[in-house]
Amino acid sequence: MDLTFPKHLYYEPEHHVWCLVESDQKIRLGIDPLGISSLGELAYLSLNPLESQIRKGQAMGVLEAAKMTGELIAPLSGSIIERNREALEDPYQVNQDPYGKGWLCVIECEDWKTESEHLITGEAVEAWSEKEMERYRSQGWID
């Protein structure tokens, strides 16, 4: 898998969720390639229902993968306004194309300016991603 991290995206550093700002309040979410590589092949993906409220740091769904089963943690608070039906039906799309066909959902963020303060973006992405890849390699989570 290509472990690239586009600098125009925002990254939640602990749970490896990426955020794409589509408008002031509409934010597209997905799992970054490092998070996916450490999980292994996704077999099952479930997201909270449309229009449900999600809270930063709380579950917004569940995933089952080759190396782990667990909750998908929300990087922001808001309301789910769109879900990627294709990825829900075929979770392997998340593995194959995490920034494209494998996106997860779009949320309407309550307060992007405040909510995004903990996210990594721009020039900070390169240093963070290199450090994370080294940490994952040292743990044996990726090759």
Which sequence ranges carry the predicted segments?
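Conserved hydrophobic positions within beta-strands
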Residues: H16-W18, L63, L72, I80
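Polar, enzyme-active/binding microenvironments
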Residues: E126
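Short hydrophobic beta/alpha edge segments that flank linear recognition/processing sites
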Residues: I54-L72, Y92-N95, G102-E108
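Short, conserved beta-turn/loop elements at beta-strand boundaries and strand-helix junctions
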Residues: V21-D24, R83-E89, T114
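Acidic, low-complexity mobile loops and tails
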Residues: M1-K56, K101-C109, H118-G122, E130, ...
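Short beta-strands and strand-coil junctions in structured, solvent-facing domains, enriched
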Residues: T69, K113-E115
